[in-house]
Amino acid sequence: FDEEMVVALETHDFEPVKVLQWRNNRLDFSSIDALRDSLEMAPDHRSLTRVPVATDQHALEFVARNEAGRLARGLDGARLLWECCQIPDYQGISPANHGEIVTRIYSDLVKHRHVGEDWIAEQVRFCDNASGDIDTLSNRIRQIRTWTFVANRKNWLADPSHWREKTRDIEDRLSDALHERLTQRFVDRRTS
């Protein structure tokens, strides 16, 4: 930080904020359309502005346009859909790709009461590889975090304790491998 910034921080001397971003927190789960409308609600104060559309809202729009959106009926259906839409996009993938993940999870939950065991196993197995360079390992860590999040959701998996342990173990091994690659890179640069 430069000296001016340090002084401003120490003396709490900042430019006044003229506009704050806002998103409605009183969501209407009576239907998908009602939920979408409540998310689109404009603030009622002139010093507030709506936040940019977030990942969860993009996912909601994606699911609402496909077959899974028709599965969301009533309060419970819309509320569960919104919970699924709030799966973080740790991978930073396209809204459509993230929407596909949300769609699959929501569809499985509605149709089978749990995310499909074979499907989650396939997703986790794909991440379970500690070889590769720094970028590859970083990507796998982001991917496994999605499945760790899913494993920690109440009642989403038939055997959540198994998947929590499995995803945590994979993430730990990937993190260790990434640390090793970063250390090696640092050592290689220092010795050359």
Feature map (PLM): residue ranges:
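C-terminal or mid-to-C-terminal helical accessory/interaction module adjacent to the motor/catalytic core
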Residues: 1-82
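Extended, charged helical/alpha-beta scaffold domains that provide interaction surfaces
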Residues: 69-192
